[in-house]
Amino acid sequence: LKCHNTQLPFIYKTCPEGKNLCFKATLKKFPLKFPVKRGCADNCPKNSALLKYVCCSTDKCN
C-alpha cells in the first residue's frame, strides 16, 4: 500500500507490513479541508476535538 505522508499530494511512501490503511487528518474548524497530517495506519485514528480523520485502503487515496 502506498500512502501520502506529507501535506504535498505528490509525495508518498510504501507502508510497512501490517499497516493496511492510509489516513488524512484535517482541522474540524478550518473552512478549507487542507490536510495537516497524512500517513499509514493499522487502525483508523479516532477523531479528536480538533482533528477529523478519514481512512481508506487503496494506493495514494489520502
From Swiss-Prot:
Query: Which Pfam families has this protein been placed in?
Result: Toxin_cobra-type
Does the record bear Disulfide bond in its keywords? yes
**Expressing tissues:** Expressed by the venom gland.
**Keywords noted in UniProt:** Cytolysis, Disulfide bond, Hemolysis, Membrane, Secreted, Target cell membrane, Target membrane, Toxin
Any one Gene Ontology cellular component term annotated for this protein:
other organism cell membrane
Main location class: secreted
Keyword Membrane, does the record have it? Answer: yes
Set out the biological process GO terms recorded for this chain's protein. Answer: killing of cells of another organism
Q: Which GO terms describe its molecular function?
A: toxin activity
Report the domain of life of the source organism. Eukaryota
Localization per Swiss-Prot or TrEMBL: Secreted; Target cell membrane
Q: In this UniProt entry, which cysteines form S-S bonds?
A: C3-C22, C15-C40, C44-C55, C56-C61
Which SUPFAM superfamilies does the record match to this protein? Answer: Snake toxin-like
Q: Do you know which InterPro entries this protein is assigned to?
A: Cytotoxin_Cobra, Snake_3FTx, Snake_toxin-like_sf, Snake_toxin_con_site, Toxin_cobra-type
Additional comment: Is classified as a P-type cytotoxin, since a proline residue stands at position 31 (Pro-31 in standard classification).
| Family (UniProt) | Belongs to the three-finger toxin family. Short-chain subfamily. Orphan group XV sub-subfamily.
Q: What does this protein do?
A: Has low cytotoxic activity.
Protein's name according to its UniProt entry: Cytotoxin-like basic protein
Record organism: Naja naja (Indian cobra)
